């Protein structure tokens, strides 16, 4: 087997789209059945990756003309203790199995971090598929998340808010601006640019809904992204700027009690939701969420 030094390393271009998509499909085991379930066709999902190659830095390793390993760095901003920093979000990390174990990914990471430093990015982030691997490469866990399961009888019933909830389109401006406002006041939150929003929705089913809570002055103060399937409400994301919006969203969830048996969702480690329940005997699971490392302390 060749060593990492014997391969070619370069940034991918749009001409590499077919190989880029093939490596992603193989590594993350995206089947035709899964594409159909989410409403995608193979050519559509491939074409949807064009913006990634155009607006993100995708570094690849080639054995001859064949792409064998890659990862993408999305240019984002992050709120860290009320200061906004430029960060590189590493994603789409993948290598064909026959090329693992010989230092390719380590070399790609070094080159990627070096480029981030040149571009003035302060931090690098990723969602790990292997915590020990990234520990070995110098990354550390920086956040956790709580996954929760709530029975329909445990949904808060004694909550009410003076405002109202409306379902809106995925590209609704108030919805996007509300997330930006939330990010501006929340430590550890990423600001989403157009590319990040595209990735946010990539694998969501068409029946996924966005519900926004408005106060009595018609100001959006919270939202939830959710899907109802097989009598379960799956909450992808729920944020709120104040307690009123939080209560309003839970009131909205309770309005679905005749349609659902359970609520499944995720929340921040610092915000356990058992305290919000009339019956706090719910299932909550804490797991590591994101890993990060400092790129530049200047």
Language-model-detected regions and their locations in the chain:
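Short amphipathic alpha-helix that is part of the acyltransferase structural core
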Residues: 2-75, 82, 89, 155-195, ...
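A short, internal acetyl-CoA/4′-phosphopantetheine-binding micro-motif in the GNAT/acyltransferase core
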Residues: 90-100, 232-243
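Conserved acetyl-CoA pyrophosphate-binding loop and the N-cap/start of the following alpha-helix
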Residues: 99-111, 244-248
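Conserved GNAT acetyl-CoA-binding A-motif
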Residues: 109, 114-128, 258-268
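Conserved active-site alpha-helix within GNAT-family acetyltransferase domains
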Residues: 118-122, 128-146, 248, 270-286
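Amide-forming acyltransferase catalytic core, primarily the GNAT-like/NAT-type
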Residues: 144-236, 243-247, 251-256, 284-298
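C-terminal amphipathic alpha-helical segment
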Residues: 258-298
